[in-house]
A protein has these predicted regions:
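Interaction-mediating elements
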Residues: 1-127
């Protein structure tokens, strides 16, 4: 179960926010093979003055459309799967929204299953 936080400029329309959310989820389904209903995200609209970033980092230019995608998931994905996920998310967003691939920053954090509760105060993934 990935849990996704998406931080983006507050000025984005609801349509763009929803599209980005769906594109991230589609990418997770495609690469990580998660079920369709495994869809847990929070979208955080952020005022421009609160989005801090350099104009250029690692030879990648950034604009005011910069978004941060934070994915927290269970362990077990290979480096190749993670790289494929990053590429697919950036490509899908660049093709379908005003956000360029340069402006898609992704951070993925793996955490053990003992750190997850899907309700009822139970760590359901612990056998």
């Amino acid at each position: 179960m990935p849990f996704v936080n998406i931080y983006l400029p507050a000025g984005f329309t609801q349509q763009v926010k929803t599209r980005i959310s769906l594109l991230v989820h589609e990418s997770l389904m495609s690469v990580f093979k998660i079920p369709e209903k495994d869809y847990f995200q929070v979208i955080h609209p952020v005022m421009a003055e609160h989005l801090i970033y350099p104009d250029n980092y690692l030879n990648v230019p950034h604009t005011a459309n910069l978004i941060y995608i934070q994915v927290t998931c269970g362990p077990g994905r290979t480096i190749e799967m993670k790289q494929a996920l990053y590429a697919l998310i950036a490509e899908k967003i660049a093709v379908s929204t005003p956000v360029s691939a340069n402006d898609v920053i992704i951070v993925l954090t793996e955490t053990g299953w003992e750190n997850w509760s899907f309700g009822q105060g139970i760590a359901q993934m612990i056998k």
